[in-house]
Each structure stands twice: as C-alpha cells, then as structure tokens.
Regions:
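Hydrophobic, Leu/Ile/Phe/Ala-enriched alpha-helical segments that form helix-helix packing faces
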Residues: 17-29, 90, 94, 135, ...
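Short aromatic-glycine-(Arg/Gly/Cys) micro-motifs in beta-strand/loop hairpins
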Residues: 40-75
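Compact, glycine/acidic-enriched structural inserts
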Residues: 80-102
C-alpha cells in the first residue's frame, strides 16, 4: 500500500478508480457516448473510492459509484441521500447478492454447466459478503466520517 500522505500517489490511485467507474457506467449503457463527470464524495485511502457520476449531457441522471478493493458497482443517486447512506446501500445489496449466489450454487449440478469453466459460486458469494461486511463497518464507524477522511 502506498504512503497515505503521498498526494501524487493518491491522486493517481483515485484517477484509476474513476476511470474504472466511467468504464463501468458506459459498459452498462447508463451513460451513453457522453463525457462522464465523476466527483469523489468519500474515500478510505487506497481501498475505497465512492463518487457521484453523471453524463455531461444527462446531468439529471446521477449515480453513486464505488470502486477500489471492491467490485465496481453503481446505484441510482436517489437511493441514497449521502455517501454514508450509499455505502450502507452497497453493503446491503452485496449481502443479498452474496446469499443469492451461494444458494444458486447448490442448485447447479455439473451437467447443467455447459462451459468447461467451473465457478465456485459459494466462494464468490462468501467474497461478496466479506466485502459487504467491510464497507458496512466503514459506514458504521464514526471516525471514518470526520472531515479528514473526505475528499
């Protein structure tokens, strides 16, 4: 992990996360052929970047986007009033998705998988649940919401 006081290294890391966010939104056609505007709202240095994003031509459609040591993901901005609420929303969503993925793994037999690639969905579900617990703990800890942690 880089030095938390190295502003240049942090800017480079944050820029990389914002590029991943823009790619995520464009790949899902949420922002179509439009310049993506991304503004960081909160970070846990070198681990989590939470931002609001929108298209320059479609500023009325905003999204909360998360990236870093977690899956790049988004929610509509109306689902959370602030960064802390957005982080909690992602945590709940990932908990539910993790449980759903794990339960689906029990229902899939090897003969049902047409690909030679075998995915351990139980492990995927566990990983998603771990990420959810991590970000919920960050959202729940008052120390993470002091002004020194905001961008």
């Amino acid at each position: 992990m880089s030095n938390p006081n190295d502003k240049e290294a942090f800017r480079a890391w944050a820029h990389e996360q914002m590029q991943a966010m823009a790619k995520h939104l464009k790949s899902r056609s949420l922002i179509d052929k439009d310049e993506v505007k991304i503004e960081a709202r909160w970070n846990y240095p070198y681990r989590i970047l939470l931002a609001e994003a929108w298209g320059v031509k479609s500023a009325h459609e905003k999204f909360w986007v998360i990236a870093g040591d977690v899956p790049v993901d988004h929610i509509e901005s109306g689902l959370a009033l602030d960064a802390r609420a957005a982080l909690k929303h992602f945590a709940l969503r990932w908990q539910m998705q993790g449980a759903r993925v794990k339960s689906a793994d029990r229902d899939v037999t090897p003969d049902m998988q047409h690909s030679k690639l075998r995915v351990n969905w139980s492990e995927v579900g566990d990983t998603l649940a771990e990420k959810a617990e991590f970000i919920y703990a960050l959202a729940d800890d008052e120390r993470n919401w002091e002004s020194t942690m905001r961008m």
